[in-house]
């Protein structure tokens, strides 16, 4: 944990629960980050781990008035419940209530993809667009849909769970029980796994990206990921017709090595119309945490986030 400074007024905690790590930050009313940190996710005891983090943050910051929680999977935001999150081994967990009990302050839960979209819409690359699609690509893949300036969660709170949509039917198995899912081929975890499976070397996505063009396996794995993403984005573009596509999450750090071939592939698939603009998320890998902090401010009764400038 790193501490920048203390605060005298109200503060808000944003906690981003991922399949690999849990990241958090404390933000004050003007949007200054006071404290931030991370620790590896203990998938066998996520609820207890998050409650412990919240308790420590509340103890260290008496001005804490709200906690925003975000995680992947099927999330009932109204009830603050993780209905099902395959990568976290959670099913039917009332996470917001657990954190409220641990901290003594209001807590709210949101899907991590929608939280990143919320942050990009208010503070980042989505500003000025009434409709956009935000796709964070990390351990998993999801999308946030901003339609008519409103985030769309769907009839069963599962809008945007594209990571578990079969993109290559009958393909490689996914942890969700299906086969050929987008996450299997195009998530950061999936890219690293497929390379390791083919070569016996676990080198990670950054090394795979650097090896494009010189390592035939890295090139094939990367090109397959780009094609899978383009197929998914083609389906979504033709369904909801957004004006902008924002790529975020850890894989977005690849920059034009990812975005340039993705633009080209998407344009080749949309044969009868122009493709939407594809841009990199301006908040980078911290977009989810900023969304969680906005959620914390809202549950704490504040609209101060409207003035934040990350």
Located regions from the model:
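Short loop/edge segments at beta-strand edges and connector loops
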Residues: 109-113
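A short acidic/small-residue loop/turn micro-motif
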Residues: 40-43, 90, 158-161
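Short beta-strand scaffold segments in enzyme catalytic cores
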Residues: 22-26, 141-146
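ATP-binding/phosphotransfer module of carbohydrate and carboxylate kinases, centering on a glycine-rich
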Residues: 1-66, 76-79, 97-107, 119-129, ...
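A charged helix-plus-loop insertion that forms the helical arch/lid used to bind
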Residues: 80-91
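Short hydrophobic alpha-helix segments
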Residues: 37-39, 86, 155
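A short acidic Gly-Thr/Ser loop motif
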Residues: 16-20, 136-140, 158
């Amino acid at each position: 944990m790193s501490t920048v400074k203390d605060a005298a007024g109200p503060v808000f905690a944003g906690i981003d629960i991922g399949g690999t790590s849990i990241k958090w930050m404390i933000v004050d009313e003007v949007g200054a980050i006071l404290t931030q940190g991370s620790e590896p996710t203990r998938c066998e005891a996520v609820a207890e781990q998050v409650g412990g983090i919240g308790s420590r943050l509340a103890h260290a910051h008496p001005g804490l008035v709200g906690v925003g929680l975000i995680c992947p999977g099927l999330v009932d935001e109204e009830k603050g419940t993780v209905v099902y999150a395959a990568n976290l081994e959670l099913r039917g967990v009332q996470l917001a209530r657990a954190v409220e009990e641990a901290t003594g302050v209001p807590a709210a839960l949101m899907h991590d993809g929608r939280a990143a979209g919320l942050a990009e819409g208010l503070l980042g690359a989505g500003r000025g667009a009434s409709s956009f699609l935000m796709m964070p690509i990390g351990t998993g893949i999801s999308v946030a849909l901003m339609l008519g300036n409103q985030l769309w969660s769907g009839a069963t709170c599962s809008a945007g769970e594209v990571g578990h949509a079969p993109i290559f039917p009958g393909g490689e198995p996914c942890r969700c029980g299906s086969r050929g899912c987008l996450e299997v081929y195009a998530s950061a975890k999936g890219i690293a796994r497929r390379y390791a499976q083919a070569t016996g070397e676990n080198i990670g996505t950054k090394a795979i990206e650097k090896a494009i063009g010189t390592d035939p396996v890295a090139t094939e794995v990367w090109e397959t990921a780009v094609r899978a993403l383009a197929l998914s984005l083609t389906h979504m573009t033709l369904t909801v017709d957004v004006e902008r596509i924002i790529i975020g999450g850890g894989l977005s750090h690849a920059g034009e090595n990812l975005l340039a071939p993705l633009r080209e592939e998407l344009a080749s698939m949309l044969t009868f119309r122009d493709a939407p603009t594809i841009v990199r998320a301006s908040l980078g890998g911290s977009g989810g945490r900023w969304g969680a902090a906005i959620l914390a401010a809202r549950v704490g009764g504040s609209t101060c986030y409207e003035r934040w400038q990350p």
